[in-house]
Amino acid sequence: MTGVSHRFPCRVYYEDTDHGGVVYYANYLKFMERGRTEYLRSAGIELDSIEKDKGVMFAVTEANVRYLSPALFNDLLEVESTLTHARGARLTFNQQIWCIHRKHKTRDTLLTEAEIKLACIDRDGNARRIPASLIPVLNIHQTKELANG
């Protein structure tokens, strides 16, 4: 279940920046959250549905982030998310945020990289195993991604 990447484009808006037009450091975590959500959505996993139907959700328990270069107002970014671990009650993602070159529309600069660990929890905040029905969905998604890659 490792090695499959999902790419999510996003734009830096004024609200994401400080007074100097540089992305505020905590906002990279928001971009990564969106990237993980879209990764799971592309695998057919809707986070609101699993909370409603299975009574579980995923909570970040650890974020190890390296800031390498700043993103600026109006930059086009690409969040790459790779699921590297799914076992028991834990998911681990490696994520990178790239700046996309304005003219060539290709990756230009690696801005941020992170390892994000999540726990599967119930509505009371207690750890729960990842529902067995979600694991095959992720495996099917991986097979599709590898076939399309």
Residue spans for each PLM region:
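Hot-dog-fold acyl-thioester-processing enzymes
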Residues: T2-A59, I121-G149
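HotDog/MaoC-like acyl-thioester-processing domains
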Residues: S5, R41, A71-L76, T84-G149
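Preference for bulky hydrophobic residues occupying beta-strand positions
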Residues: C10-V12, V65, S81, Q95, ...
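Short, well-ordered turn and helix-capping elements at secondary-structure junctions
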Residues: V12-D16, E62-S69, H101
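Helix-adjacent hinge/juxtasegments
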Residues: M57-L83
